[in-house]
C-alpha cells in the first residue's frame, strides 16, 4: 500500500504517458483529488501464475485499505503487460472478480504496454471514512 502523494502522482503520470490499448486520460485523473492510496503489484512475466499472484497482492492491499477506511469511493486501475506475457483471456475473469468484489462507487481502467519483464497492476484508490465527508 502506497500513501506517499509524490509517488502516487508519479504513478498517475505513468498511466497517462504509457502507450495504451485502453487509455487513462488527464481528465480521468482530475477526478482523483484527495484521500489517495495506491497499490503497485508486480510479478515476473515468466511466472505462469503471474496474474493470479498480482491479484492476490491486490486483494491483500484492498483488505488493508478497508480495515482503515470505511469506503472506497473511486478506483483508477491500470494493467501493465509485457509483450512476452500478453494477458490471457483466462486471466480476465479473475481480474473482473476482483473489481466486482471491491465496494466502490465508480472506477475507470486502462491497459498498456510495460517495458519491464513483469506483469504489473496499479490501482489508485480514493478512500474515505464514513463518519466524515473528508477523504483521507
Model-derived regions, located:
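Tubulin/FtsZ superfamily GTPase core signature
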Residues: 1-136
